[in-house]
Design a protein with these regions (language model features):
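N-terminal [4Fe-4S]-dependent radical SAM core
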Residues: 1-29, 33-80
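Conserved AdoMet/S-adenosylmethionine-binding subsite of the radical SAM
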Residues: 62-234, 238
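Acidic carboxylate-rich catalytic motifs and surrounding loops in phosphoryl-/glycosyl-chemistry enzymes
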Residues: 121, 183, 242-256
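Non-transmembrane, interaction-prone segments in cytosolic or luminal domains
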Residues: 1-5, 9-11, 17, 21-27, ...
């Protein structure tokens, strides 16, 4: 893999459900077509020139050294560290990235700081063996069970079945788990049952739900506001009954 260095690693994120975050890889082989906001920003600021370049991840080789310097200074300000907002810590098929991510989790935990992990890859079984923080939480992005949809919009990511299996294994090994259910598709993109999707991951501790933005197909669906209000109600009732913590992202629910 190609490698580069950076001058800093930890930063405070403006994402509404985030705190601090790190992105120890540049690029992502999953090649999401929602479109990918991270890829758009990388192009805008000159880090990449094309989609094809984004698909070739570059590892930040001095990430652990930067954390050694930054964590002691920032420790008292950090509630948790999210991995990651502009890349994937367990990118499908990249063992070198997986190994670094596991080392980073252990490093952050050694400062008694929990991590919040999110992937479209497969959560490794070795997570149960690394240094644990009781507030660590491990998650997958899951907006459908339809593999045709996944192949269209998340072409390089792991299958939905494999993601759920790895998440279930984390749960069964006593780890906290969560789901990022965004961007959730409108029926003109993917006709599906939200309840069926929720039942498949009813064991999780936390769900983030959000509408699909920045896509002409969504805006072309004439009842998109009504649809997302209805889906928000369904997921709210489901989570209340199952005692699952829920965050519905700003802008998902529309006021009449």
């Amino acid at each position: 893999m190609k490698k580069i260095t950076r001058k800093s690693m930890l930063y405070k994120t403006g994402v509404e459900y985030g705190d601090y975050t790190i992105n120890h890889v540049q690029g992502c082989s999953h090649g999401c077509m929602f479109p990918c906001y991270a890829m758009q920003m990388a192009k805008r600021f000159g880090k990449i020139k094309s989609y094809e370049e984004w698909l070739e991840p570059i590892i930040i080789e001095n990430a652990l050294e930067l954390l050694d310097a930054e964590l002691p200074k920032q420790k008292k300000n950090i509630k948790f560290v999210h991995m990651c907002f502009t890349t994937d810590p367990f990118m499908y098929g990249f063992k070198e990235i997986e190994d670094m991510s596991l080392s980073i989790i252990s490093k952050i935990n050694s400062f008694d700081i929990p991590v919040e992990v999110l992937t479209k890859g497969i959560l490794p079984t070795s997570l149960k063996d690394i240094l644990k923080n009781k507030n660590n939480i491990f998650g997958i992005t899951l907006v459908s069970l339809n593999e045709d949809f996944r192949k269209r919009f998340e072409p390089g990511a792991s299958s939905y079945a494999d993601r759920i299996k790895s998440l279930r294994e984390c749960h069964d090994n006593g780890l906290k788990t969560w789901i990022s259910m965004e961007p959730y598709p409108t029926p003109n993109i993917c006709e599906q049952s939200l309840i069926e999707l929720l039942e498949a991951i009813s064991f999780v501790d936390y769900i983030v739900f959000g509408r699909w933005n920045y896509n002409k197909l969504v805006s072309a669906y004439k009842d998109d506001k009504k649809f997302y209000n209805e889906q928000a109600s369904i997921i709210s009732n489901f989570c209340k009954k199952r005692k699952i913590r829920l965050h519905i992202k700003d802008g998902t629910i529309s006021e009449d």
